[in-house]
């Protein structure tokens, strides 16, 4: 400190000018105060900068959180819309499948194919074959007669009815094909597999949202550590 510094003369030369000791002590005292003031000001500025940085960090974090919340809400709404869309597509696919199968069983070649398979699988005894077909198959009567004569060695009786069923019998053997039942069964099989689609979409939605939440937590924690 200044009081421990020996000053042999009441006057000290400073840049060739004699300055009294009291004036010199008063000068150094003022200088110390200025230094302390500068140091304190620097400390206050440093603390203010740290506080501002902290406030910016929390403000950014709060804004980031709100941004993530908004994003999550939008993603959730989007994925929910996708689930709704999945249900609509399921209904459309079932309608399309029903139309497709109905058109297939109504096609003349389908009747001929079914009869051809039946005739091949039936035992061919000497008994008479009875065949009852939908009346709309009458337009293919000639083709049916050729098919029966080529594949059935015995006699046969062919008639038509107003129902949609194909019925063929010989002795104790009988076969029946219902286009309506076939269509319903086929559509039911497709529906069974499609029923898993909304659940798959829901699982994807949950996984996507959880992944976004995890990412948000990771980034938020990283900002806090900084």
Swiss-Prot record:
A single Gene Ontology CC term: cytoplasm
Q: Which domain of life is it from?
A: Bacteria
Name the Gene Ontology biological process terms.
Answer: protein transport
Q: Which residues cross the membrane?
A: none
Please tell me whether the keyword Protein transport is annotated for this protein.
Answer: yes
Which keywords belong to this entry? Cytoplasm, Protein transport, Transport, Virulence
Q: What happens when the gene is disrupted?
A: Deletion of the gene disrupts proper SpaO/SctQ localization.
The name under which this protein is listed is SPI-1 type 3 secretion system stator protein
Supply the source organism for this entry: Salmonella typhimurium (strain LT2 / SGSC1412 / ATCC 700720)
Kindly list the organism's lineage.
Bacteria, Pseudomonadati, Pseudomonadota, Gammaproteobacteria, Enterobacterales
The gene name reads sctL1
